[in-house]
Amino acid sequence: MQQMTPRKAAVLSLNSSIKNGKYTNLELDAAIKKYGFEDKDKAFFTRLFYGTVERKITLDYIIKRLSSVKFEKIEPLVLCILETGLYQVFFMDKVPDSAACNESTELVKTICPKAYAGYVNGIMRSAVREKQTILDEIAHLAGSFGLSVKYSVPEWLCKMWQADYGESREIVKALSRVKVGVALRVNTLKISAEELLSHIPKELEAKCVGKTSIVIPRSCIVTELYGYDEGLFFVQDPASTIVSSLVNKNSVGTDKPFVVDTCSCPGGKSFSMAINLGNEAEIHSMDLHENRLRLVRSGAERLGITCIATHECDGRKPLTEYFGRADAVVCDVPCSGLGVIAKKPDIRYKTYAEIEKLPEVQYDILEASKNYLKDGGFIIYSTCTLRKAENENVVQKFLDNNKDFELCPTGIFGDETGMVTFLPHKTGTDGFFAAKLIRKK
């Protein structure tokens, strides 16, 4: 039986991810577990797999330029072989061009009809010969199409960011490269960030961000870090931690506040708020799916948080027994996720049609969630996307239809408007949005 190689595994995993619509991180984890690679091969496989996903638009541009066959007619497995092969040529300096060509050609013979071997070999050798010419050509591509090809982000997305924020290039550059590290939200009920940092291996190059977060830029296994089993931290980007900090002892103004988290899974914001409130609150964490709520309960148990109750509930159909009781409501609504494509590279390949109707769902959840609030209470509306249609526009529509609500300054990055956008090239965080809406007394 032929041994599984990192190159072959990358091709098969890419094809499986596309064919089955599986998230790339899940596909990667499954492959690593299945094939049991040693560290060196695992690192090569991970780089090749994620890198090819990250650079797919760029690689497909090169294939279209060199192929004698129409792009749409290239067999899926052959396309994956070409993409991984060209990624090695253009983006993996330590891989000899000859190895990339030969291995790609041999790979065709093992998993595709052998007739394709000459076709793949021809494209690979043409790419090596014309490498610098192709790179120069891509560097000189202009406008939104040029941005799309250079950074492998869909052209419609480049155009939208330019229209929404006026700085498409900076956003695209910040979000186009896959992040391999992780951010931890420290459970300050049990330990300080500085003390936890002292237990993290120096080679991971971890650093504290504020008093509650630790950022680790290196790849690591979170469950093997010091303090995981003891509940000393959980995974949460600093942007989400900052937004969660808007619900604290001072902002709610009561000893045991009543808080509703309408779209809570996997639980990060509920955990953060519980810690902010000293585990002395009544937090109701809701989600549409019971199997996801199990993550909230198990996470709370690991962290030693006892003030969270979970409820299976559609955010658009609020639980009437809690109407008029909440001091604070958090609506971290389902969104397009365009602010986190550096962590989840497959998100960038969503089509506009896939996200077009999200603002309707988001507005319905926000509109329903207002019923939980008491007079003087506030709503935090948030997303992990960079798209005004899902952010400012939803909030403005809500304000237009609910005159008993008004924006309240968040104070985040000096915000005085009540709405704040985390642009990753400026904040160093995920792309994020938050608004604070207070119900008038």
Per-segment meaning from a language model:
Residues 1-441:
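S-adenosylmethionine
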